[in-house]
UniProtKB/Swiss-Prot annotation:
<dbReference type="Pfam" id="PF04794">
    <property type="entry name" value="YdjC"/>
</dbReference>
<dbReference type="GO" id="GO:0019213">
    <property type="term" value="F:deacetylase activity"/>
</dbReference>
<keyword id="KW-0378">Hydrolase</keyword>
<comment type="function">
    <text>Probably catalyzes the deacetylation of acetylated carbohydrates an important step in the degradation of oligosaccharides.</text>
</comment>
<keyword id="KW-0119">Carbohydrate metabolism</keyword>
<feature type="binding site">
    <location>
        <position position="125"/>
    </location>
    <ligand>
        <name>Mg(2+)</name>
    </ligand>
</feature>
<comment type="similarity">
    <text>Belongs to the YdjC deacetylase family.</text>
</comment>
<dbReference type="GO" id="GO:0046872">
    <property type="term" value="F:metal ion binding"/>
</dbReference>
<dbReference type="GO" id="GO:0016811">
    <property type="term" value="F:hydrolase activity, acting on carbon-nitrogen (but not peptide) bonds, in linear amides"/>
</dbReference>
<feature type="binding site">
    <location>
        <position position="59"/>
    </location>
    <ligand>
        <name>Mg(2+)</name>
    </ligand>
</feature>
<keyword id="KW-0460">Magnesium</keyword>
<dbReference type="InterPro" id="IPR011330">
    <property type="entry name" value="Glyco_hydro/deAcase_b/a-brl"/>
</dbReference>
<dbReference type="InterPro" id="IPR022948">
    <property type="entry name" value="COD_ChbG_bac"/>
</dbReference>
<keyword id="KW-0479">Metal-binding</keyword>
<dbReference type="GO" id="GO:0000272">
    <property type="term" value="P:polysaccharide catabolic process"/>
</dbReference>
<dbReference type="InterPro" id="IPR006879">
    <property type="entry name" value="YdjC-like"/>
</dbReference>
<protein>
    <recommendedName>
        <fullName>Carbohydrate deacetylase</fullName>
        <ecNumber>3.5.1.-</ecNumber>
    </recommendedName>
</protein>
Length: 245
């Protein structure tokens, strides 16, 4: 089997940037996805350019912070910020203009490209793929990139995806045992499994803007551990990135 350890939230805070960098340089993370509207976007771009082996994707969002574009009336609240989560976006989806969705997501992609970053794949913040899949699919074809697999879609056409998207390594599931169970389930197959991760060093920026904080430092510890890397080697698990699909 092959595993892609993808680190979400690149740029959400300086601590997240450095936590992901640590998980890449000393651990098993080879891919990460960058938030175009994140507080530490410039730092993330700088780190990405200094580490060309780290595979960069776009972490498309309609639920975090403020949009790249202005005047998106159906996507934002009275303060001009995105609605806060998947549920609030889903509940208001009937009133969302999908043209606004496409324009904003395109702007996020173009901001990353304009910064000199090559994008290999797309995923989304708060896993909103089921709500915007037609737009995401269209943009993936346009930019020639891979996307994160999700269970609501059975036919991805010519777009490359892993065979499975694993979300278990999150919150109370952040443990070495979680990854071992995943490996044992797929060992001996040709499956490509993406494991969602959120490693970060905790800082005040992260505490202020994210509800998922404390487990992130534990993720760094596990993803960089010699024990995990030795186990994956013993099981002949190949660690790859989205570039390798």
């Amino acid at each position: 089997m092959k595993i892609i350890f993808n680190a979400d939230d690149f740029g959400i805070s300086p601590g997240a940037v450095y936590g992901i960098l640590e998980s890449y340089k000393r651990g098993v993370v080879k891919s990460t996805t960058l938030l175009a509207n994140s507080p530490a976007f410039d730092l993330a771009v700088e780190v990405a350019k200094e580490n060309p082996g780290l595979d960069i994707g776009a972490h498309l969002t309609l639920t975090f912070g403020s949009p790249v574009l202005q005047g998106l009336e159906t996507l934002t609240d009275d303060d001009g910020r995105f609605r806060r989560n998947y549920t609030s976006l889903e509940n208001g989806l009937a009133d969302v203009d999908m043209n606004e969705v496409e324009r904003e997501l395109t702007a996020q992609i173009e901001k990353i490209l304009d910064a000199g970053i090559t994008i290999s794949h797309f995923d989304t913040h708060h896993s909103i793929e089921p709500l915007i899949y037609p737009v995401q699919h269209k943009l993936a074809e346009k930019y020639g990139v891979s996307i994160r697999r999700h269970s609501d879609v059975s036919d991805f056409g010519a777009i490359k995806t892993p065979d499975l998207f694993a979300t278990e390594f999150y919150a109370d599931g952040v443990s070495f045992e979680t990854i071992k169970k995943l490996v044992q389930k797929h060992i001996g197959t040709n499956d490509v499994v993406e494991v969602m991760t959120h490693p970060a060093f905790i800082d005040e920026t992260l505490r202020e803007i994210s509800s998922y904080v404390e487990p992130r430092i534990k993720e760094v510890s596990i993803l960089t551990s010699r024990e995990l890397q030795a186990y994956l080697g013993q099981q002949e698990v190949e660690i790859i990135s989205f570039r390798d699909l």
